[in-house]
Curated annotation (Swiss-Prot):
This is Aspartate carbamoyltransferase catalytic subunit. GO terms for molecular function: amino acid binding; aspartate carbamoyltransferase activity. Its EC number is 2.1.3.2. Disulfide bonds: none annotated. It comes from Mycobacterium leprae (strain TN). GO terms for biological process: 'de novo' pyrimidine nucleobase biosynthetic process; 'de novo' UMP biosynthetic process; amino acid metabolic process. The keyword Protease does not apply. Heterododecamer (2C3:3R2) of six catalytic PyrB chains organized as two trimers (C3), and six regulatory PyrI chains organized as three dimers (R2). Signal peptide: none annotated. It catalyses: carbamoyl phosphate + L-aspartate = N-carbamoyl-L-aspartate + phosphate + H(+). One of its GO terms (cellular component) is cytosol. InterPro entries: Asp/Orn_carbamoyltranf_P-bd (IPR006132), Asp/Orn_carbamoylTrfase (IPR006130), Asp/Orn_carbamoylTrfase_sf (IPR036901), Asp_carbamoyltransf (IPR002082), Asp_carbamoyltransf_Asp/Orn-bd (IPR006131).
Amino acid sequence: MMRRHLLNAGDLSRDDAIAIFDDADRFAHALVGREIKKLPTLRGRTVITMFYENSTRTRVSFEVAGKWMSANVINVSPAGSSVGKGESLRDTALTLRAAGADALIIRHPASGAAHLLADWTAAETGEDGPAVINAGDGTHEHPTQALLDALTIRQRLGSIEGRRILIVGDILHSRVARSNVVLLDTLGAEVVLVAPRTLLPIGVDGWPATVSCDFDAELPAADAVLMLRVQAERMNGGFFPSVREYSCLYGLTERRQALLPGHAVVLHPGPMLRGMEIASSVADSSQSAVLQQVSNGVHVRMAVLFHVLVGTQSAEEEGAA
């Protein structure tokens, strides 16, 4: 049973994930052909987004998801709030709870920030506070990204169980990689992490995945390839000799794309560094599901908001989609 919050991919059972996928598909279908994309599902609910890091896809898709479900969506940013005057995250959280927030969606540079938010908003009265959804906390996790990636794979390949999925690039700094490894393992996939040793975290051998430093060798047996951006903003040293050498060894070029099976799907959580980890021709090819991921991001986040705010019944049973 899915909890009130979504803080980690590990919060989700296989049944939880499948229910979210099914409801995401239902919401997508319910919106087809509507001149005005509005469902009454969350009418009267207040959803507040708190983005302390830059974001395009995640922030926009959460806002669109809430608005398409008729929620009141309010954005709180450091620059335009008392955070810019030095207010702590805890005081901001308690203020938003007192103002009547039903859900708080947070992206923060500190790992564990979403957990603290959930604890703080519940501790004052001992009652359930607002639902908290982790939209990315430091290098820790990004569970809704893992959900939309997995849904995209399911739509493209028909199933996830037994599929061999490569996650390639900056594993060390990637919350997307961490959440995907956990969720894909829960769903029965075989996950292979491909990266130079310098971009693999300590303890990676204990993850439910195998590790390889040879990209070319892994491609012929891959069903899906998830490419990751090198997160230079989180680096303070030399993790590889040069951009050119990194791209040569770990970039998804046309030559490497030709090594993939014809059915394989290429994914990227964005933003893409074209010409570094992925060639433009590959990103724009028929095997690429990058824009499908963006579309699925809205529908998955609609489903997540539905589950944390309405309950564990499906959207179909509730008549919400």
